[in-house]
């Protein structure tokens, strides 16, 4: 049973609409869908939305992406949650924009936020929802790319992806991870 949905991103207005903040975007949408307490609380280095009707919290770590593990560890401790009871939502360069993948566990795949979580909580055994953002043409452009906003053309598809990710998470909360995989794992292009 999932007890915390953790959307990864970078805090601050500067990063609000960037590719790296897809996790935050999904977290906001889910919090709205579940009618969570909109007055987030600063706890565990995160903005926490409490959703008492669903016995789940939505967290947006405020540690910056590369230090996400610190926030996740504090969430686990403060809320007495096991790694298997969190769902981490984040951007994935290796998936095209429009792809969504739900996984029970796995490696970091080179994602620094996930790497930080794995290194800090000492396990890869936590569920995650990967949101494809595509990859830039040149490898040296990766950091600029993930910190750039979506183009006007991409925004149309992004809205569909965010809606699908929201539905996926609602499904996970209702039916669990394994029963939700077929519904969640899609390419929307």
Curated annotation (Swiss-Prot):
Record-level GO cellular component terms: cytoplasm
EC code(s) of this entry: 3.1.1.29
Superkingdom, natural source: Bacteria
Catalytic activity annotation: an N-acyl-L-alpha-aminoacyl-tRNA + H2O = an N-acyl-L-amino acid + a tRNA + H(+)
Subcellular location: Cytoplasm
Keyword vocabulary terms for this entry: Cytoplasm, Hydrolase, RNA-binding, tRNA-binding
Residues annotated as the enzyme's active site: 20 (proton acceptor)
Database matches in Pfam families: Pept_tRNA_hydro
Primary subcellular site in the record, as a coarse category: cytoplasm
Subunit structure: Monomer.
Protein name (record): Peptidyl-tRNA hydrolase
